[in-house]
Design a protein with these regions (language model features):
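Short, solvent-exposed loop/turn segments at secondary-structure junctions
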Residues: 18, 71-74, 96-98, 166
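Extended catalytic core of nucleotide-activated donor transferases of GT-like folds
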Residues: 84-85, 95-99, 125
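Donor nucleotide-sugar binding/catalytic pocket of nucleotide-sugar-dependent glycosyltransferases
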Residues: 26-30, 35-53, 117-172
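A short acidic, amphipathic alpha-helical/loop segment
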Residues: 77-81, 172
């Protein structure tokens, strides 16, 4: 996908409204979601893939190291950089992106209950792609590290970098 979006002058409107996307969504619908209203499913897929395709359409500058503060779309940009240039990708998560999006979606009124699972799966796939490409993934505490491993990052490529603020040194300021 990275190469496709870089070498082709992709019209996102033409892509999302085109026959190929329509048939891919239709196939997915028949295989996994035949009980949903198709028009709602199609528009959900379009709205779900638009931000990903916008991200994939971005120009990424050459760098030796890419650093993302989350696995989401920032992580995808880091993956793109690593794909196009000989480089490293570091992800420093203060929270676990997938879990944060899952919590937001569960509480969200704007997403129909039927579609929450699909959105959560999408964010999980994006995170897994970033974890797969990252050279190192850091977290602030051990439980977050364990979630990163559970979501697919190899244990030896994770580490805890605790918040290094020494509060006692700042108490009198």
């Amino acid at each position: 996908l990275f190469d496709y979006f870089r070498t082709e002058k992709v019209s996102l409107n033409r892509l999302l409204m085109g026959e190929d996307f329509y048939h891919a969504v239709l196939d997915c619908y028949h295989l996994q979601y035949p009980d949903m209203v198709f028009s709602d499913f199609l528009w959900t897929m379009r709205s779900m893939y638009l931000p990903l395709f916008l991200t994939l359409s971005m120009e990424i500058p050459r760098a030796d190291v890419y650093h993302a503060v989350a696995t989401g779309y920032a992580g995808i940009l880091g993956c793109m950089g690593k794909h196009f240039y000989p480089s490293q990708l570091i992800i420093s998560e203060h929270g676990i992106y997938t879990r944060e999006r899952e919590e937001e979606l569960i509480k969200a009124d704007w997403v129909q209950r039927l579609y929450k699972k699909i959105w959560i799966q999408q964010f999980k796939k994006i995170s897994q792609a970033a974890y797969h490409q990252a050279d190192i993934v850091t977290s602030l505490y051990q439980q977050a590290r364990e979630l990163q491993i559970e979501l697919g990052k190899k244990k030896k490529k994770t580490m805890v970098t605790p918040n290094g603020i020494q509060y006692h040194r700042l108490e009198n300021l």
